[in-house]
A protein has these predicted regions:
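Nucleotide/phosphate-binding catalytic cleft detector across ATP-hydrolyzing
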Residues: 1-140
């Protein structure tokens, strides 16, 4: 299983099937907590559809900022949801996961991605650095 954790969207692909998931990188939680709504299922499209239609006690969190994890616990919940959703056909099988990470992230940030994926139910996690956008860091 390959995962591209994006600031806006997360893509998941499976060997032989291609991209099987393309959902917003957003999680709906009870305001002031990290409690993910709907038993941990208020993630991706479900969370995005809740925006603007829910009481003020619910907030949407984008757990990645500038390509890195800004909220470890929420990223773990998001990864867990996406892995469960894609792997649902084979719940007893823990997938090997390859995750694309920005080339400039620190060792601490890499460890956070690894731990999030491991806790989300992956058997083995591999990180692959993605090339940096050449426009990144250019002054305007």
């Amino acid at each position: 299983m390959g995962i591209d954790l994006g600031t806006c969207n997360t893509l998941v692909c499976v060997r032989g099937e291609g991209i099987v998931l393309n959902e917003p990188s957003v999680v709906a939680v009870k305001k002031g907590t990290n409690h993910v709504l709907q038993n941990g299922n208020a993630v991706g499209w479900v969370a995005k559809e809740m925006l603007g239609k829910t009481p003020g006690s619910i907030t949407a969190i984008r757990p990645l900022k500038d390509g890195v994890i800004s909220d470890f616990e929420i990223t773990e919940a998001m990864l867990s949801y996406f892995i469960r959703k894609v792997n649902g056909r084979r719940p007893m099988v823990k997938p090997r996961v390859v995750i694309a990470v920005p080339s400039g992230i620190t060792a601490v940030e890499k460890r956070a991605v690894l731990e999030s994926a491991e806790r989300a139910g992956s058997r083995r996690v591999y990180l692959v650095e993605e090339p940096m956008d050449p426009r990144h860091g250019v002054e305007r």
